Amino acid sequence: MENAVWSVIKYTPKHGCSDEFKMALERLAEIMNKPDLTWSLIELDTGEIVQISRIPSIDAIVEGQIAGLEWLDSVDHLLEKDEEGSRTQAYSGLELDAPHSFQVKN
């Protein structure tokens, strides 16, 4: 069985654009609405939004990549960019099958 992939993506809405960005997250929710995806959004006290996703495989990531990038392009004007021009701060990696993981069923 292929390991699942976890992804953590942080978005920083521009000042005054937070409400519009949150409304745009509804379109992202439609893209992410797949039975095999687990994901959630949290809002930090800094106003940043963090998307945490568990995707069942690398193939599933590739499958949704175009729709995800199109969504990100559609909200580009609402997001702060870092000094290199990136709209997000993102991390991803393969899920470890560890005994303490909440994914392990007893």
What are the residue ranges of the model-derived segments?
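Active-site-flanking beta-strand signature of metal-NTP-handling nucleotidyl enzymes
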Residues: 4-11, 50-52
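Short coil/turn motifs at beta-sheet boundaries
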Residues: 2-4, 44
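Short, low-order "capping/linker" segments at domain edges
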Residues: 89-106
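Non-catalytic surface loops within mature trypsin-like serine protease
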Residues: 13-15, 55-57, 106
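A short beta-turn/loop motif at secondary-structure boundaries
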Residues: 40-46
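An amphipathic, aromatic/His-enriched active-site/gating alpha helix that lines ligand/cofactor pockets
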Residues: 27-39, 54-92
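Short, surface-exposed ligand-recognition loops at beta-strand->loop->(often short) alpha-helix junctions
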Residues: 10-23
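A compositional/biophysical signature of low hydrophobicity enriched in polar/charged and small residues
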Residues: 13, 44, 94-96
